[in-house]
Amino acid sequence: KTISSWGSGGAILTDNKRIADKAKKLRLHGKQTNNESAIHPGLNSMMSSFECACVLVGLEHSDEWQKRRHKIASYLKEKSPYACATSNLKMHTHSKLVFQSAKRSEIQEQLKQNGISSTVHYNLMINDEPLYRGGKTLPISKRLKEISFTVPNQHTLTDAEVEHIGKHLK
């Protein structure tokens, strides 16, 4: 996920409501809408020709963008007292810069007050989705879900923006 793409494409033509409803769910990870839980397995593999062309352009810049994300990640890891989920990896794409703290909510509020976005990914673990309930419990994954958050790490960030994030990621 280090090269962005936009939009989606493809079409299914049918006058059968049941088929149309199922096709809509299959194209969105088995969900009716993005805010709902999966009710059966599905995919998200939609890509138009235009998206493909944009990705090809992105490939020309991917090494440069990767170096910039690595530089930003190194700086923010150095400035932050919080554990970084990627701190022990020699090579990482840094498509997401994940920090961990039991004080996640407080940290996110502080970042928000200073105009810095932070995100919690994977609020609902796959084994908690209605479709997969009743299987294994994953206590380590659950704990990581509760303490992990990401901060901006796009290659487009200016040095001043990176310093601003580093100043408030404390």
What are these regions (language model features)?
Residues T2, W6-I12:
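Glycine-rich phosphate-binding loop of ATP-grasp-fold ATP-dependent ligases
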